[in-house]
């Protein structure tokens, strides 16, 4: 079997004990093998390292991505949640290895502009590497979902791991309401305006919407 437009991210817990997390060669390659087996695939299109590892040398992590590509288990390498300076170092290592590094995956929205502050957005442009952003709607805050309270079936009440009452602050809601009024003046929904804002710069290659139900699309 073969993958079509499939990607895999590694950088969080895969198993208990040593090398079960972060960015070591053992972790990345073993977790990729496990994931391919579970998915019933021979390869993924993009294999991401999910986050910077403060303990493992960058050369080891990038070497593992290179090995994944050259072994035929991934077509391209990607990075997720890196800052600009570290991404540039990683890019130089991968270029020297002749490993195709094509994409960064980072959080980006009207409310979260970290990639502008940490240099990732500018560095990606300089290196000619794309950015695919996630949480462009700030987990539903930049839609009409929470403008008038918290619905019973929302992730705030049913899950709460990534969006909870502590993060859904009154300040954010007030800002979202103000943005919603601006969107109305423009003749569009808040969600549409928020997505257009993320895509306004050609540094952003694509956007992961992150819908939880088909009707949200």
Locations of the language-model features?
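Hydrophobic packing within well-folded, soluble alpha/beta domains
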Residues: 6, 35, 44-47, 65, ...
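A short acidic, helix-capping loop that chelates divalent metal ions and anchors anionic groups
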Residues: 12-18, 142, 216
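Beta/alpha (TIM)-barrel catalytic core signal, keyed to glycine-rich beta->alpha loops juxtaposed to Asp/Glu
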Residues: 56-216
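Short, acidic/polar
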Residues: 23-39, 87-91
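Active-site mouth loops of central-metabolism enzymes
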Residues: 13-29, 50, 55
